[in-house]
Amino acid sequence: MTVAERADIQIRVWGIPAPQGSKAVRGYVNGRAILGESSKAVAPWRVDVRAATQNQYTGPALSCPVSLCATFLFARPKAHYGTGRNAERLKESAPRYLTSVRHGDLDKLIRSTADGLSISAGGTLLEDDSLIVQVMADKRYCEEGELPGAYLTVTKLN
C-alpha cells in the first residue's frame, strides 16, 4: 500500500453533535408500528455531517475497511466562565471533557455520525458504515476559538 492510498481523510463538521438513540413509535399503519428517531436533533446533525463531507471530500465512496477517529466538540456553559470583568475568562476549575448525560453517550454520537458518512444514509464518504472496523473517539468542550461540531479522520485500512 502506498502512502497516497493510506492518506487520512480529514473532515471538519460544524454544528451541534447529536446522539442517535433508540427508535420511538410514531404511529401505526395496518397494525404495523412506524418508527422514527427519538431525538429531533439527530437529523440536523446528519445533514451537517453529510454537507461537510460533500464539501471537503471529492473522491469516490470508500468500499474498504476504515478506521474512524472522532472528536466531538460542545459549547461551554456560562458557568465555566467568570462573572463581571472576568466574564470572558475561563475558570481554572472548568473541565476539559464533557461528561453530561444531556449531550449523549459517546457510542450514540459515533452512531449518528457514521450514518451521516455512509451512502446508505445519504452520505458520500463510505459505501456503508459497517466498513468502520476501528474507532477512537472523545467528546470535549470547545477551546477558545473553536466552534461546536466534530473533527473526523477516516483512514483506509486496506
Question: What do the PLM-derived regions correspond to, one by one?
Answer:
Residues 1-158:
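Acidic, proline/glycine-enriched N-terminal capping motif
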